[in-house]
Amino acid sequence: AYCNELIQPIIIPFVPEKGKTVICDFENDELGKAYGMTGGSQAVVENDPDGKSGKALHVGTDDNKAAYSHPKFNVKLPEGRKLGDYVNLTIDMRIVNEDGIYGAGMRVFINGKEFNVGMNAKTFGCNPNTWNRGAVISLNSATAPGFILPDEMKGLTEFELAVGSASGGAQYFLDNIVMHYELPG
């Protein structure tokens, strides 16, 4: 019995390497800086309307709603990281009034390829004129909110990312766009 205890296998727990890459938090941007859009309207850096978290990106306006148009971000991942290492994308989102809270749902675009995350901004956790902080979109699950990243995109280290509410009349704020990675330990 004593010898059996000596030759028992040692279980080494799996400890994945986890981390995050901040895509955009807008704090280093000048007020009024414009980001490109996938279609019409505009995306401009403004102060957080609640005055609590510095700067945020205002997508659409009262007079020029974002109609199925989303802000675009040029992403260059840190050295050694590729898109397939990332398990999710988190965003802070604040819908103005109810502009785009329902619509056709939340969307993510990678190099122009559209992914439907399976829910609209309301079911994603947004309420009018209130921040929904740290909302998670999975990059490796078809369960909403999420999608399966295609194999051919997993090796990307630079790409164009767009994210937002697909609606004929959207207006919202985005902040703290962050991607989280997880690698085998």
Protein language model annotation of sequence segments:
Residues 80-90, 101, 156:
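Extended extracellular/luminal ectodomain segments enriched in beta-structured repeat modules
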Residues 28, 90-99:
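Solvent-exposed strand-to-loop "edge" motifs in beta-rich extracellular domains
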Residues 63-84:
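Short beta-strands within extracellular/lumenal beta-sheet-rich domains
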